[in-house]
Amino acid sequence: MVRSFPPARVDRIIVHQFDPARPSPGGIDSCIRGILRYLPDGLDVAVLGVDTGFSQSGRRVGQWEEHRLANGRNFWFLPVASLDPANQTRRVPHSLRLMLGILRYRRKVPMTNVVQVHRMDSALAVRVLVGKPLAYFIHTQEDGLTGRTSDSIWRFAARAHRRLESFVVRRAKSVVVFNEAYSKFIRKLNPKAIFSPTWFDPLLIKRESASRDKFKILWVGRFEIPKDPVLAVETFNRLVQMDPGSPWSLDMVGSGTLLEHVRNEVNSLPPHTAERIRLLGRVPPEDVAAAMAQSSVFLMTSHQGYEGFPRVLVESMASGLPSVVTAGSDTGGLVDEGITGFVSSRRPDELAEKLTKSVSLDRDQVRNSVTRLDAPRLVTRILDLDHTELTAVGGS
């Protein structure tokens, strides 16, 4: 990172509570990192984001930075507010603080051809503050933010969210929906909308590890209600009861408001079970990839109706992990029953039984089932919507 100024005009501005210095839990952060890593040559991109407090010394809010990646690509970054997106106990919504920061530093924002946004409320504000065409990204199912298991404030105003999102979609230059079912509805509002699966970053994925543990289960996600980390603990407890002779273990990666609750749940288990569960907290993507390389099976316990196209499932399968998922969480239909994993009800005993079956599945078949979902290919397709003239968009 060096202090620098972007050109007077850039091709694209990305707006989100994003900090290149520290990854945050969730698919949006990973999406933005993938886009920045695989930018086409010659595309100038600036990011209006936040300072999480973990950057290199010398950073100042309101001061531009130039970030150069190992592959030679670069982008500009302007932190406009100080906040940690992973802190879900905030009193003031993160999106509001981000917009207030953009308002404060709007004179420093360059001209642009398109503004990329990942939230409906941010999109509404950006239309006023920046006044440029929108590239709107939707990461959830139709009622993903407003359903009963959502942790979004919009669950209290579902009708308003639906109307406002329709307003944004109709006026966007491009719309990318990471959920195939919802994309069909969105395309009725804006014919330019496309469906895109999420992707894995081939530079992060580790094919195999000499230390891969046949009995290690991995769970990755935010410790929030939609992801239901408590169910993972309950499932593991049942697994140990069903198969006490095998050295099963569970690594849980992530953080959130339920972390202490989960810790208490673990501590309440019998000691010989609790000692096999590790709560690893918030770790960078490289460490998540290493954990996937060392594990044997991936467990996903999200509630039905929330996930758009779960990126962590794509990443785990690209790492060769058979996956056991709760019904409704694999919205991309990636899990081929008995071949690449298993779909289960939310009953801990059924989840546990399918975990025992998953360790015998062929890792190469799992890995090969998602090879088409690599970041370089899908990022290029998405950016082509706004930055090249296309006669057709395949797979839409």
Model-identified regions with their sequence ranges:
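A conserved mid-protein helix/loop that constitutes part of the nucleotide-sugar donor-binding site
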Residues: 30-34, 215, 222-241, 257-260, ...
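Membrane-proximal helix-turn-helix segments that form the acceptor-binding/catalytic region
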Residues: 103, 107, 142, 155-175
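Active-site proximal beta-strand in glycosyltransferases
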Residues: 114-116, 128-148, 175-176, 194, ...
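Carbohydrate-associated surface elements
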Residues: 181, 199
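Nucleotide-activated donor-binding/catalytic signature segment of Leloir-type glycosyltransferases, i.e.
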Residues: 263-286
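Acidic donor-binding loop of glycosyltransferase active sites
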Residues: 293-307, 321
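Short hydrophobic beta-strand element within catalytic cores of glycosyltransferases
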Residues: 322-326
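Conserved acidic donor-binding segment of nucleotide-sugar-dependent glycosyltransferases
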Residues: 336-348, 355-360
